[in-house]
Amino acid sequence: MFELNNFDALQIGLASPEQIREWSRGEVKKPETINYRTLKPERDGLFCERIFGPIKDWECHCGKYKRVRYKGIVCDRCGVEVTKSKVRRERMAHIELAAPVSHIWYFKGIPSRMGLILDMSPRALEKVLYFASYIVIDPKETSLLKKQLLNEKEYREACDKYGEESFVAGMGAEAIKTLLSEIDLERTAAELKEELKQSTGQKKVRIIRRLEVVESFKSSGNKPEWMVVDVIPVIPPDLRPMVQLDGGRFATSDLNDLYRRVINRNNRLKKLLDLGAPDIIVRNEKRMLQEAVDALIDNGRRGRPVTGPGNRPLKSLSDMLKGKQGRFRQNLLGKRVDYSGRSVIVVGPELKMYQCGLPKEMALELFKPFVMKKLVEDGVAHNIKSAKRMVERVMPQVWDVLEEVIADHPVLLNRAPTLHRLGIQAFQPVLVEGRAIKLHPLVCTAYNADFDGDQMAVHVPLSVEAQAEARFLMLAAGNIMKPSDGRPVCVPTQDMVLGSYYLTMDKDGAKGEGKYFASFDEVIMAYQLKEVDIHAKINVKVTKEIDGELKSGIIKTTPGFIIFNECIPQDLGFVNRENPEEMFNLEIDFLITKKSLGKIIDKCYLKHGPTKTSIMLDNIKATGYHYSSIGAVTVAASDMIVPQKKYELLKEADETVDKIEKMYRRGLISEDERYERVIEKWTETTEEVADTLMNSLDKFNPIFMMADSGARGSKSQIKQLAGMRGLMASPSGKIIELPIRASFREGLDVLEYFISTHGARKGNADTALKTADSGYLTRRLVDVSQDVIVREHDCGTQNGIYVEEIKEGSEVVEQLAERLTGRYTAEDVFHPETGELLAAKDTYMDPILAEKIADTGIQKVKIRSVFTCDSKVGVCTKCYGMNMATSYKINIGEAVGIVAAQSIGEPGTQLTMRTFHTGGVAGADITQGLPRVEELFEARKPKGLAIVSEVAGTVRIEETKKKRTVYVVTDSGEEYSYDIPFGSRLKVKDGIAIGAGDEITEGSVNPHDIMSIKGVDGAREYLLSEVQKVYRLQGVDINDKHLEVVVRQMTRKIKVTEQGDTNLLPGVMIDMFDFRAENERVESFGGEKAQGDIVLLGITKAALATDSFLSAASFQETTRVLTDAAIKGKIDPLVGLKENVIIGKLIPAGTGMMKYRSLKLNTENSNQETETIIEIEE
């Protein structure tokens, strides 16, 4: 058996009959499975021991040879080889068919490969294969045509007319096999190429398709006649097991039934042929054999599926591979693993950031082998057996050993659904009593976990390498930033925020206000002795050593600020230490909210790195919890004070609405206008009530504190608690014009409550539906971008893209500095006024340089981008730039494709889950959200299409009674006219200038139109900005580079239009880099280059168009992908992640890259080795 790690590629092809016989250990001749009395396999049956190997280890069928000492002997009585029973998982057999049978994949697939190569329609082919028509194989001298179909009557007439010997006709797979074997591929290909030059239209398309199939057979070495099978392989018996249930009945795999039908019909056909039965009977039997083989290979593809008991269709070989429950997705891409456990999680506020609490009994079971080894090493137990007994009986010595074993062995915690890479993190386990896993409160955001009964799984990394990776790459304390946008993900929440907020408030007239203190320690002492209130404004003398001399100053602060600042490094840059007036100030002297905590973490991470940040976070956590307990901020009904002004506002609104109604009744305004105005008035009133409420709340009001600090709740929720609920939407999404006047504090009446239920129910239904949609979107994104890995330092491209700040209307939504941070320049950047060089080409822009460039007022900058990267596989570090999760330059081996897919998919689920939080208050629901993102990534024609101008020019609008027409006049005077359909709103005005690709009417643009007008760059830019718009509306930040990775994968294929002297066929889609390489090859000997256009593929299509057939087959349309790959004899280069997971190799990313794996440390010639290592680290 070959080693699983030493091959570089995998090829798939058609199996010839010889090859199938070569795999086989014998022929299955009988349909019997096992003997019902002895329960032993029948000889020559589907489970025969002589063919497949013994059922029990080292024991033959008849029992003459038992025990391992007879290893390898073939029993002379029963013919069974004495060996391990595991061989029954790998030994195959075969069935010799009495008549050839066509393989349904090649006959029935779309397009029918058999039909193409024979130039017959699938319907004609079906008639021949299923014995409804004869086909002329050799017309000889007669006037019949080759491949002409004859029905029964015509065949008889021809026989009478010409005599039976004067021509050859046949039916069934035999005839087709003869025709296939007669095909001369070289000649057919040459003829088709000639025809191609003359033909056009539909005929040309058909010829190209045929040529493709012929060329595939030519290049792959497959023979066309192998699409018809003479001999059928039988898969090993342990892969289609038969097991005895309680009560003596048997459960068996469906495949056994399907094989039995094939064998029965085959044996019957053999008998009929030996007897010389009449033609019509033999023909019927052959047809039945063909159908049985079809059902075995792909049940239900043609006609009605074969059903088992209870009318359930049987699972055929194809079904074993397909879908979520098939071999690919169920067993190859997702396996269950040993050394794992799961339990409910509870909060562990006393833990450090890198720790998790592991229940004692679970830890003992997970680390059992380690504990046993240690027990023997320490001499507590004499051998492994007694050690095992000690562990199983849980003797007291075991616990001490467990403590030692666990000491520096990280474990992985995972919470389903794992939407992004932060859904699995490593922790240092701490043994805890009880049966629940303890989780650090700060990592809950990353896991999206709460403690209402969530469960989590624990996994133990076994090997030293796995432990090292867990400790250095996956430890929770190191994963503070979100890979999607580089913002901190461990921002303290809820109580921690509330405690910090409470601590940093100040109060006029508090006890001890205005006192002077000599030092911070004195303040703390006074606070502990209750001499001074935590919110009192006091003065403190601060002494510091500056440039070797002691200086002191007096600052105004509160005890709370002093306590809070003990957690925070005092050099984060919030205070300008150069300025003598600010020199002694505390680093944090502003009110702490969730937002400002995020900023503090950001600055600390950039300045001090992850370790110090995690220590700071733990300090903030402890302080926050402590002071939110001391502050005892809680909610009572008396805290919701309904402002008296509310009733005046309502009265005023009622009067206005009455006026609007009167105007409507007098016919001064239309129904629509009345509705609009009423809605507008009530919205305005609700807002006014909310504002009045917020202004009337005391700053120490607990509800206000919770919302203002960002701990929990929002203005909208406070408005509903103590203001008024306002307008609601009906199930259709239309706003009901009667508002809910009451707040929850006052209580809703029956009608108001009923109206409220619409939104709540809609929210729940939406959530359930959209979660599935979002998960599927993520899966497609992962599949399309999974092979994008950083593979090299610099691809050497000269290209880039221009970026500028993004505006929506007059408001800047993303500044230039944000877009430049962490990217490389693609050309020299000069100051727009002075002309000085700000950054040379290929300079990395950190936040400081990016700020500096943006501040000069420069409009746009050309940067290196994933779009223009020239790496054939993956991307290079310079085109990618900064790793968002670490804020450092990206490393070679980083799986940026998967990270991109997760970054786009993960908020998708959240967008969809966020609809129900407002309880159905009328607002912008994200209907245009998820479906819009999907529509863009699938490059579909959008709903509500806008009309786009194909050229740049000046607009002229003409309106007649019947229609409106927009004319665009170019500079050269050409006119292009566009008819505007009724009800469309124009985006352009008469006489203005517009560019090519600009919208004339409102609506979404078809990305394919942009592609044809503005080219590939325009289309990429459009997709990027449109997807960003949707996410931004939801307040989700995703870095551009993630979208760039996916969009690049959508625009990688070229459709060949002109062949030139290349080997590329027109109409074929090919990877951009292969296209370039082929053109360069032709150019080298002066030939004519091929022409082609870049095509925009949706993510599903792009994922199926990948070079790897394993990856595509495990994604969707498994049978179609495999059929195609087998005919072409495709070679899978195993460059992506999925392919390698499927065949069980290490993935070629991270430490699994060949570059890192081939490192060896040689002590003899160490200087050479160190050179290679240095080169890798740079």
UniProtKB/Swiss-Prot annotation:
Belongs to the RNA polymerase beta' chain family. DNA-dependent RNA polymerase catalyzes the transcription of DNA into RNA using the four ribonucleoside triphosphates as substrates. Its cofactor is Mg(2+); Zn(2+). Binds 1 Mg(2+) ion per subunit. Binds 2 Zn(2+) ions per subunit. CDD domains: RNAP_beta'_C, RNAP_beta'_N. The RNAP catalytic core consists of 2 alpha, 1 beta, 1 beta' and 1 omega subunit. When a sigma factor is associated with the core the holoenzyme is formed, which can initiate transcription. The keyword Phosphoprotein does not apply. SMART domains: RPOLA_N (SM00663). Zn(2+) 2 binds at C795, C869, C876, C879. Mg(2+) binds at D450, D452, D454. It comes from Clostridium perfringens (strain 13 / Type A). It catalyses: RNA(n) + a ribonucleoside 5'-triphosphate = RNA(n+1) + diphosphate. Disulfide bonds: none annotated. This is DNA-directed RNA polymerase subunit beta'.
